[in-house]
Regions:
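GIY-YIG nuclease catalytic motif and its immediate N-terminal context
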Residues: 1-38, 43-53, 60-67, 84-86, ...
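Short arginine-rich
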Residues: 67-80
């Protein structure tokens, strides 16, 4: 069974901040961000809206892509988000369809 790795971008309601991360479980990780389970930057700035993600079979490629995106200026990151999600819609409801959602007491997946 092959694992999938994800590079994702999340923002807050006002889109003031844009966070880039990597995970092997996008559903679980988004749930953790939305519930404030991750101390630090994302909790402080209430980063809870998934606006972009890519998937990879090889973790080295995912790590490389995450580093690449983190090195970009904000304008280039915004343009990347808009290639998939021009309205900056929160994509997390799509992830949680048919699963225990963000209101559950434990993370889905």
């Amino acid at each position: 069974m092959t694992k999938t790795f994800y590079v994702y971008l999340m923002t807050n309601r006002s889109r003031v901040v844009l966070y880039t991360g990597i995970t092997n479980s996008l559903v679980r990780r988004v749930w953790e961000h939305q519930n404030g389970d991750i101390e630090g930057f994302t909790k402080k700035y209430r980063v809870n809206r998934l606006v972009y993600y890519e998937n990879f079979d090889d973790p080295r490629n995912a790590i490389s892509r995450e580093k690449e995106i983190k090195g970009w200026r904000r304008g280039k990151k915004n343009a990347l988000v808009e290639t998939l999600n021009p309205k900056w819609t929160d994509l997390s409801p799509m992830l949680f369809q048919g699963m225990r959602g963000p209101s559950s007491s434990s993370p889905p997946g």
